[in-house]
C-alpha cells in the first residue's frame, strides 16, 4: 500500500508524473524538471514535503535527551524558534539520519526527519529515551510545503494575515514561528531564500491552491534533487548512511565538540577518527566537458580511489557536477579522474557547493 500525502489530488490535477519514493506516491515532475528547477532559481517554486516526518520531543528532560541523541548541541538554542541542522549517529559513529531541530523551550522541541528513515528513526529515538522524562510524538495531522526562490517570500506574504506577516518580517535563516494555523520556517533544501511551512492537513489543499493562483510553480522530486545537489546539500542514503561517519560526509561543521563532557552517541568513535585523520572527505566535482557524473562512478586519484555519491547535470551551470567521497589528501583545485564508459575523464575538485542564491559559488 503506497502512502499518499494530503496534497496527492492536487498533484494529479496539475498533471504530475508520480513515482514511488520510499513508499510514498510523489510527483517527480509536472512536465519539465528543467523548467521547475529554473523557476526556483529565478522566481518561486513549491514542493510538497508532507512525506517528511515531524516529531515533537517534549518533557522535563527534552534538552538533556537531545544533547545525548545528536552531534550538534541544542544547548546553543536560546531564542524560541531558532533551529539547527544536525546528525543522529549510531554507536559506531555512522549516520542514522540528518535532521533539523527547532527550539521552542528547554522542554519543547520539534524535529523534522527524513521520510525514508521514519521507522528506524522513531525506533532509535524511543530506544534511546529510556531513563529520560520525555514524550516523543509524531505529528501526521500536518502537511508541509517548501516555497523556495527569490520571489518566494513575497508570494507567500500575499497569503498571510497581518499578524503572520509581522511575525516573519526580517526573520533570519534557520528560524521558525508558529502563528495562527501555520508554522513558518526560514529553512529549505535548494540554496535559495524561502520558507518551509507546516500546515494542518485540512487546510493544506487550500494553501497549495492559493500559491498556484499567485503563480508559484509546482515542482517535483526531480527538480528538488538537482537544486539540492547544486547547493551542495546531502541526500540521506546517497551521500551518507549508517556506514559513513559525519567526518566523511561534510558534516563535521555540525559536530559540537564543546563542552567536552557532553556524551553524545558516537562521540568516542568520532574522537578517535578525528585524531587518526584518516577519514575520507566529501568534495565537489565539476565536469565542464560533455558527459554526466553519476552516483557510484569510481573516482581515481594519486592517493587512491573514491566514489561519486551524487551526480547530475546542473541546469543552472549548464554542465555536470557531483559530490564524491575521496581520500583526505585530495585538495580543492586538484584535477582528478572519473571512470565513465570505460574511459578516465578529468574533473576539477571544488568545495562541495556549486550554486547559492542563483549564482555560481566555486
Swiss-Prot record:
It is an enzyme of class 2 (transferase). It catalyses: N(6)-[(R)-S(8)-aminomethyldihydrolipoyl]-L-lysyl-[protein] + (6S)-5,6,7,8-tetrahydrofolate = N(6)-[(R)-dihydrolipoyl]-L-lysyl-[protein] + (6R)-5,10-methylene-5,6,7,8-tetrahydrofolate + NH4(+). Belongs to the GcvT family. GO terms for molecular function: aminomethyltransferase activity; transaminase activity. Its EC number is 2.1.2.10. NCBIfam families: gcvT, PRK00389.1. The glycine cleavage system is composed of four proteins: P, T, L and H. GO terms for biological process: glycine decarboxylation via glycine cleavage system. InterPro entries: GCS_T (IPR006223), GCS_T_bac (IPR022903), GCST_C (IPR013977), GCV_T_N (IPR006222), GcvT/YgfZ/DmdA (IPR028896), GcvT/YgfZ_C (IPR029043), TrmE/GcvT_dom1 (IPR027266). This is Aminomethyltransferase. Gene3D superfamilies: Aminomethyltransferase beta-barrel domains, Aminomethyltransferase fragment, Probable tRNA modification gtpase trme, domain 1. The glycine cleavage system catalyzes the degradation of glycine. GO terms for cellular component: cytosol; glycine cleavage complex.
Amino acid at each position: 500500500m503506497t502512502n499518499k500525502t494530503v496534497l496527492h489530488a492536487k498533484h494529479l490535477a496539475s498533471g504530475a508524473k508520480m513515482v514511488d519514493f520510499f513508499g510514498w506516491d510523489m510527483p517527480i515532475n509536472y512536465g519539465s524538471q528543467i523548467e521547475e528547477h529554473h523557476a526556483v532559481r529565478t522566481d518561486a517554486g513549491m514542493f510538497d514535503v508532507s512525506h517528511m516526518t515531524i516529531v515533537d520531543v517534549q518533557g522535563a528532560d527534552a534538552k538533556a535527551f537531545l544533547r545525548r541523541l545528536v552531534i550538534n548541541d541544542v544547548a546553543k538554542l536560546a531564542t524560541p524558534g531558532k533551529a539547527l541542522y544536525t546528525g543522529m549517529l549510531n554507536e559506531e559513529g555512522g549516520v542514522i539520519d540528518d535532521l533539523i531541530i527547532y527550539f521552542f523551550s528547554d522542554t519543547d522541541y520539534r524535529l523534522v526527519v527524513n521520510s525514508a528513515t521514519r521507522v528506524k528513526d522513531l525506533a532509535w529515538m524511543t530506544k534511546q529515551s529510556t531513563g529520560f522524562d520525555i514524550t516523543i510524538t509524531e505529528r501526521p495531522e500536518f502537511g508541509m510545503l517548501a516555497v523556495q526562490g527569490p520571489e518566494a517570500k513575497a508570494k507567500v506574504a500575499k497569503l498571510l494575515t497581518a499578524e503572520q506577516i509581522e511575525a516573519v518580517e526580517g526573520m533570519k535563516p534557520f528560524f521558525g514561528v508558529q502563528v495562527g494555523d501555520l508554522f513558518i520556517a526560514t529553512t529549505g533544501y535548494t540554496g535559495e531564500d524561502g520558507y518551509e511551512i507546516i500546515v494542518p492537513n485540512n487546510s493544506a489543499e487550500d494553501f497549495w491552491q492559493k500559491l498556484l493562483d499567485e503563480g508559484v510553480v509546482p515542482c517535483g522530486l526531480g527538480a528538488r534533487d538537482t537544486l539540492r545537489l547544486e547547493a551542495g546539500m546531502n541526500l540521506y542514503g546517497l551521500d551518507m548512511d549508517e556506514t559513513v561517519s559525519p567526518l566523511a560526509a561534510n558534516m563535521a561543521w555540525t559536530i559540537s565538540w564543546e563542552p567536552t563532557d557532553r556524551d553524545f552517541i558516537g562521540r568516542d568513535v568520532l574522537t578517535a577518527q578525528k585524531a587518526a585523520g584518516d577519514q575520507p572527505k566529501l568534495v565537489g566535482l565539476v565536469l565542464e566537458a560533455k558527459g554526466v557524473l553519476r552516483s557510484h562512478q569510481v573516482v581515481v586519484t594519486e592517493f587512491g580511489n573514491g566514489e561519486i555519491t551524487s551526480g547530475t547535470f546542473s541546469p543552472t551551470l549548464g554542465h555536470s557536477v557531483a559530490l564524491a567521497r575521496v581520500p583526505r589528501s585530495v585538495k580543492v583545485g586538484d584535477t582528478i579522474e572519473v571512470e565513465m564508459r570505460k574511459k578516465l575523464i578529468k574533473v576539477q575538485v571544488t568545495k562541495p557547493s556549486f550554486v547559492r542564491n542563483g549564482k555560481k559559488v566555486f
